[in-house]
Structures are given as C-alpha cells and as structure tokens.
Amino acid sequence: MAEPLLVVGLGNPGPNYAKTRHNVGFVVADLLAGRIGSGFKAHRKSGADIATGRLAGRAVVLAKPRTYMNESGRNVGPLAKFYSVAPADVIVIHDELDIDFGRIRLKFGGGVAGHNGLKSVAAALGTKDFQRVRVGVGRPPGRKDAATYVLEPFTSVERPEVPTICEQAADATELLIAQGLEPAQNLVHAWA
C-alpha cells in the first residue's frame, strides 16, 4: 500500500489570525477535512492538528501546524517522518503575494519568494522540492509592508470572494492529487 500524501495548510494559530490573508492555507485544509468527513485532532508526536482520510483515491494526512507560520517546519518535519512521507509527496497550501488576488497556481519546488512558512518547511524537509498550491493574495497597495499586509484581514471588497477562492484551491488540491502536477496545472492555470 502506498504511503499517504501529506497535505499541509499553512497559517497562524488563534482567532486573531483566522480571517487574515496568511491563513488561507488553514481555510483550505478545513474545507478538505470536510470533504473527507474528518475533523482535526492533535497529533502528539508532531504538535500539528491532523485529519486523515482519502482524497481523489489516495490516503492523505491533512495537517495544520500549531506553531506560528515562520516555524511551520517544526510540525511538518516530524509529521513527514512519522508517516514516512517523502518531500515530493508533501503538498503545502499557502498564501502567495506574487500572484494576483483570487488566482490559484500549482508548483513543484523552486524558491520560497520570501515566504517564511515555506522557508521553514523547506528547512525541515531538507529540500525545496515539494508540491505547492499557491493561493494568490496579491501585493500590498502603495508602500505597505508585505509582512503587515498578510497579517491583515481581507478587505470588504475581497471578503465576499474568499470562500469561492478557497473552494477553488481545495478543488485544485484534489486535481493535483488525482492527476499529478502537469495535467492539474493545465486545468487550474486556465481558470479565470
């Protein structure tokens, strides 16, 4: 039997961060947990909250690190080891400043573009070669600091679109699992 895929939604714990741009990974992970009919529970050995089940015919471990974003690898590394998941079988769902608001992009490996959550995961896995579901939050307006921007709630104009965007990111994750990177990219990257 194949080892499970590890699907990690990045975010910050606690209600103060729940509706921020940086937490779209958590929102998508919650949607995926609903799709597999599983709730999150604490995983003692890793410190993350996990839900297990099947997505697109594959065994998956969904995870939400309980550390702050910049230390996500502290939970992801031990989880990957515990479940014997190779880095290439890790899918990280995260916010992306370099993609326009509402766009979803799939990627394998490459740089971390200043995203400290990705940097922490890459350090814990010992490689940047893992799969990513990138949820576009766009660049901050004017001269606003990017670190401040991602920790702010979505604007009143953006907020009504967020549930649909997160559902699309969950759909993209399922396509990635079902079809592999290139076929899923061809479909997802064509979405308006």
Curated annotation (Swiss-Prot):
Gene3D superfamilies: Peptidyl-tRNA hydrolase (3.40.50.1470). SUPFAM superfamilies: Peptidyl-tRNA hydrolase-like. The keyword Cytoplasm applies. Signal peptide: none annotated. The record marks 12 as: Discriminates between blocked and unblocked aminoacyl-tRNA. Pfam families: Pept_tRNA_hydro. TRNA binds at residues 17, 68, 70, 116. This is Peptidyl-tRNA hydrolase.
